[in-house]
């Protein structure tokens, strides 16, 4: 295995093979861009949630408003047993989100709370090439963020990508 595959391009030393390496990296980037612009990529957003429809609503609205890029998104909401009242509120919320054209799947499986099990269940059902795990109390606050994350995730030396989480009305993380 070529050790260069695991090294970010900024760290490559200039050698006699640098031109060949530059062509290879440009070729990989072009292939990724081709997939990106052809709409062949999809991001599966997995959101574990239970008994939190008001907070979830803010999350979903910010996600759908701020994810208008080139990359298709599907949302998988994994609920491990909300009350009947909160389940109904969540289903109504999902209906409104679906009306806006965003595909949402609601996985309702009552069980003891286990965050990793909920995430894994969403991952099992996901159809996207990329998985985005998002807590239900997160609000997206910038445009173009998803495109930027996917472009970085497509690099051959990247295993995962994350963002800074800020407290509301603050620059503190």
What function would you assign to each model-found segment?
Residues 109-126:
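Glycine-rich, basic loop-to-helix element that forms the pyrophosphate-binding segment
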Residues 1-41:
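Non-catalytic membrane-proximal stalk/linker segments that position and tether the catalytic domains
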Residues 131:
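Short aromatic/hydrophobic "clamp" motif used to bind/position activated sugar donors
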Residues 80, 134-136:
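Active-site acidic Asp-centered loop
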Residues 64-108:
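Acidic donor-binding segment of Leloir-type glycosyltransferases
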Residues 43-55, 59, 66, 78, ...:
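A conserved hydrophobic helix/loop-capping motif in glycosyltransferases and polysaccharide synthases
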Residues 138-173:
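Conserved donor NDP-sugar-binding/catalytic core segment of glycosyltransferases
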């Amino acid at each position: 295995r070529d050790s260069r595959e695991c090294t970010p391009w900024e760290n490559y030393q200039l050698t006699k093979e640098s031109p060949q390496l530059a062509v290879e990296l440009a070729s990989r980037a072009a292939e990724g861009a081709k997939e990106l612009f052809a709409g062949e990529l999809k991001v599966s957003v997995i959101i574990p949630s239970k008994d939190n429809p008001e907070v979830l609503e803010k999350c979903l609205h910010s996600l759908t408003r701020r994810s208008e890029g080139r990359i298709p998104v599907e949302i998988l909401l994994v609920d491990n047993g909300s009350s009947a009242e909160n389940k109904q509120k969540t289903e109504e919320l999902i209906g409104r989100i679906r009306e806006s054209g965003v595909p949402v799947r609601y996985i309702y499986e009552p069980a003891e709370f286990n965050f990793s099990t909920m995430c894994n269940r969403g991952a099992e059902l996901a159809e996207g090439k990329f998985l985005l795990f998002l807590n239900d109390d997160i609000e997206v606050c910038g445009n173009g963020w998803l495109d930027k994350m996917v472009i970085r995730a497509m690099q051959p030396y990247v295993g995962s990508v994350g963002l800074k989480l800020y407290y509301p009305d603050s620059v503190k993380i």
